[in-house]
A protein has these predicted regions:
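Extracellular/luminal recognition modules and glycoprotein regions
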Residues: 18-63, 67
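An acidic-aromatic
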Residues: 52-112
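Cleavable N-terminal signal peptides of Sec/SRP-targeted secreted and luminal proteins
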Residues: 3-21
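A eukaryote-biased signal for long
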Residues: 135-270
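Intrinsically disordered, low-complexity segments enriched in small/polar residues
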Residues: 12, 27, 40, 125, ...
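A eukaryotic "domain-to-IDR transition" signal
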Residues: 89-139, 153
């Protein structure tokens, strides 16, 4: 296992805090895997759990589980290939329905580390899922879906994507910002591109001279997150239980979306 020197791991959590940030060393567990630093932050006021890290390949990932709106926002900052004439970086944003199996913010604020310098490997793999993001969001109007989107995705005004079934769930009222009394029609903040999306060729199959839109794929892998709470029987002789720990998981999501050309999806491979 390759080890990248890291700063001392910290946990900034008060006993009565509404916000807690746990900073840990993470590895995928593979023999040649790099170790990197990751923060997990629970905020009871905003009802969010943030997972943030910089991958060994230089991608900055922020995943926000918004329990109030019932969505997860994933921001990925990808460095550009300067020798190919690409921009220094580009930001992609994806909004998915649900908060997955992330434990709630209140539970995250109670997390502590016994061994801060340890390298964390998830106990369980939740596998790999494919997310077809065939619609785009108008970022400065997307507060009706989640109040956090305009801020998190502010650098992805043309590259914020959602799956069609998220739009359906918003229309059904199962997800969406609870702070705003008036619900806008989904068409106010989203644009469906499903007819074009189904006809796209993979960017990996295109040449750099091709300028038409193509289907791009980027992986969003979280190799360590608290996915459930553990309960133990009380020692006092009664039949009750108490929280006594967490179970940790890893999960990868293959984000598929429309890129305007191969030039903004140079990493795509088959």
């Amino acid at each position: 296992m390759k080890y990248i020197p890291l700063a001392v791991v910290l946990s900034t959590c008060g006993l009565l805090s509404v916000t807690c940030q746990l900073v840990i060393n993470v590895s995928s567990g593979e023999a040649d895997a790099n170790v990197y630093r990751q923060s997990v932050t629970g905020n009871m006021t905003s009802e969010t759990v943030n997972v943030e890290f910089l991958t060994p390949s230089g991608q900055a990932v922020l995943q926000v589980a918004d329990f109030r709106s019932g969505v997860t926002i994933t921001s990925i900052t990808i460095p550009g290939e300067q020798e190919l004439g690409e921009a220094r970086y580009q930001v992609l944003c994806f909004v998915s329905p649900g908060t997955g199996d992330m434990i709630p913010p209140e539970a995250v604020t109670k997390l502590r580390q016994k061994h801060p310098g340890a390298v964390r490997v998830a106990e369980e793999s939740r596998g790999r899922v494919v997310m077809d993001n065939s619609a785009t969001l108008i970022v400065n109007k997307a507060q009706y879906l989640s109040s956090h989107i305009p801020h998190i995705c502010k650098e992805a005004k043309e590259t914020t994507f959602v799956p069609e079934h998220l739009i359906t769930q918003y229309k059904d009222g199962t997800i969406g910002s609870k702070k705003i009394n008036v619900r806008k029609e989904a068409s106010y903040f989203s644009i469906s591109t499903s007819s074009q999306y189904s006809q796209l060729k993979r960017c990996a199959q295109m040449s750099y001279n091709d300028l038409e839109p193509c289907l791009c794929v980027v992986d969003a892998c979280v190799h360590w997150y608290p996915c459930s709470l553990k309960y133990c029987r009380n020692n006092s002789g009664d039949t009750g239980e108490h929280r006594c720990g967490i179970r940790t998981c890893s999960k990868c999501t293959e984000m598929r979306f429309t890129a305007r050309s191969k030039h903004v999806c140079s990493w795509d491979e088959l």
